């Protein structure tokens, strides 16, 4: 059976793994998931990630990050979903927690943070909020 929302599944796996203090979490890989993981790494929310292939299936393994025994990601929530896509123009891209968090946006120039999208003057689909 196919998954209806693989991005929500990825975010839920990260959230659940951090609740039980796992050091890493694995999930089926895709280009979009790898791009989201790259943004999380660049913003300092995860230690790193790797794509591993076994038996023709690629797995994305994310190394989770903790500070003083607490997860670095306090909140990770899906915004745009298959049943209700959320698109924002360059002037309407939201800030998360007054700039303390990031909104991950997929644009014609790739997946990036809300700050980079605003600086580039482009809008897109708001995938999730991370704080």
From Swiss-Prot:
The keyword Ribonucleoprotein applies. Coiled coil: none annotated. GO terms for molecular function: rRNA binding; structural constituent of ribosome. GO terms for biological process: translation. One of its GO terms (cellular component) is ribosome. Keywords: Ribonucleoprotein, Ribosomal protein, RNA-binding, rRNA-binding. The keyword Ribosomal protein applies. It comes from the Bacteria. Gene3D superfamilies: 3.30.1370.30, 3.30.1490.10. Belongs to the universal ribosomal protein uS8 family. NCBIfam families: PRK00136.1. One of the primary rRNA binding proteins, it binds directly to 16S rRNA central domain where it helps coordinate assembly of the platform of the 30S subunit. This is Small ribosomal subunit protein uS8. It comes from Leptothrix cholodnii (strain ATCC 51168 / LMG 8142 / SP-6) (Leptothrix discophora (strain SP-6)).
